[in-house]
Amino acid sequence: MASPAAGTPPFLTKTYAMVEDPSTDETISWNDSGTAFVVWRPAEFARDLLPKHFKHSNFSSFVRQLNTYGFKKVVADRWEFANDCFRRGEKHLLGGIQRRKGSGTGGAGAAPAGGIPTAIPISSPPTSSGGEPAVSSSPPRGAAGIAAGVSGAVAELEEENARLRRENARLARELARARRVCDGVRRLVSRYDHDHGGGEEEAGEGDVKPMLFGVAIGGKRSREENGEDEEEEEEEGADEDGEDDEVEEDDEERERHAARRVPVREGKVRRTTELSDLDVLALSVRAAAAARPGGASRDRKSSVS
């Protein structure tokens, strides 16, 4: 076994310091036996530790460096690397790790043919030698968690968008139904105002007429009744005129009869009139006839006759 050399490569020294640091055990640490180290969280390791020690954040470059110094990947389902001279508590063995001169030459510390894969993206899960995805016992990677969160948020947004579309369609249907109801009410009010206004005009000329479904009824009957009233008034007027003429003739006859009964003695004319109940009634009728329009003309006719 080679003795430790003073010129141990800085890559090995820095890697050993990271593995030994207890504050980074959640990201990188020894395995249970101390014969290999495990990178538990490659994403955080590349983001936080590599820039601090190696001035870069490329996890694939770190893996290629391990392959150059003869490290091999022990377990397929996690990033666990081992070298015979890289052990817990035995830092002096680091001098025995030699850098390979070329990919075709082998040495004591050369990596086997199925060595560490170098071009492995950080976001991809570890794969076995057969190329199939391997089940990892390490904590979930940050990128995978972010992708899962984004997928969940997108699904929630799509569901919310669909719900809002359904709600919008329902409100549009309710608005259309409310508009139809409003239009119907407006038409009914307009029709009522039109019919009610016509009924009032007709009522001003005659009697109030009943309405049936917005249409006035009884108009013909009212006109017939008005005609009958006019005929009755004409007949009553004719009857009254005939009665007045008869009364006047009776009065004249009674006056002549009374004049024959008045005796004339010694040049003095004395006129006596016997009034009966019939005469009183006749005089009352004459007074009433005189009070009517045209009554004065009838009185004058009576006086002349």
UniProtKB/Swiss-Prot annotation:
<comment type="function">
    <text>Transcriptional regulator that specifically binds DNA of heat shock promoter elements (HSE).</text>
</comment>
<dbReference type="InterPro" id="IPR036390">
    <property type="entry name" value="WH_DNA-bd_sf"/>
</dbReference>
<comment type="subunit">
    <text>Homotrimer.</text>
</comment>
<feature type="short sequence motif" description="Nuclear export signal">
    <location>
        <begin position="275"/>
        <end position="285"/>
    </location>
</feature>
<keyword id="KW-0804">Transcription</keyword>
<keyword id="KW-0963">Cytoplasm</keyword>
<feature type="compositionally biased region" description="Basic and acidic residues">
    <location>
        <begin position="263"/>
        <end position="274"/>
    </location>
</feature>
<dbReference type="InterPro" id="IPR000232">
    <property type="entry name" value="HSF_DNA-bd"/>
</dbReference>
<comment type="similarity">
    <text>Belongs to the HSF family. Class B subfamily.</text>
</comment>
<dbReference type="GO" id="GO:0003700">
    <property type="term" value="F:DNA-binding transcription factor activity"/>
</dbReference>
<feature type="region of interest" description="Disordered">
    <location>
        <begin position="192"/>
        <end position="278"/>
    </location>
</feature>
<keyword id="KW-0597">Phosphoprotein</keyword>
<keyword id="KW-0539">Nucleus</keyword>
<dbReference type="Pfam" id="PF00447">
    <property type="entry name" value="HSF_DNA-bind"/>
</dbReference>
<keyword id="KW-0175">Coiled coil</keyword>
<dbReference type="GO" id="GO:0005634">
    <property type="term" value="C:nucleus"/>
</dbReference>
<dbReference type="GO" id="GO:0005737">
    <property type="term" value="C:cytoplasm"/>
</dbReference>
<dbReference type="GO" id="GO:0043565">
    <property type="term" value="F:sequence-specific DNA binding"/>
</dbReference>
<dbReference type="GO" id="GO:0006357">
    <property type="term" value="P:regulation of transcription by RNA polymerase II"/>
</dbReference>
<keyword id="KW-0238">DNA-binding</keyword>
<feature type="region of interest" description="Hydrophobic repeat HR-A/B">
    <location>
        <begin position="164"/>
        <end position="193"/>
    </location>
</feature>
<feature type="compositionally biased region" description="Low complexity">
    <location>
        <begin position="110"/>
        <end position="131"/>
    </location>
</feature>
<feature type="region of interest" description="Disordered">
    <location>
        <begin position="97"/>
        <end position="144"/>
    </location>
</feature>
<dbReference type="InterPro" id="IPR036388">
    <property type="entry name" value="WH-like_DNA-bd_sf"/>
</dbReference>
<feature type="coiled-coil region">
    <location>
        <begin position="147"/>
        <end position="187"/>
    </location>
</feature>
<protein>
    <recommendedName>
        <fullName>Heat stress transcription factor B-2a</fullName>
    </recommendedName>
</protein>
<feature type="short sequence motif" description="Nuclear localization signal">
    <location>
        <begin position="268"/>
        <end position="271"/>
    </location>
</feature>
<feature type="compositionally biased region" description="Acidic residues">
    <location>
        <begin position="226"/>
        <end position="253"/>
    </location>
</feature>
<keyword id="KW-0805">Transcription regulation</keyword>
<keyword id="KW-0346">Stress response</keyword>
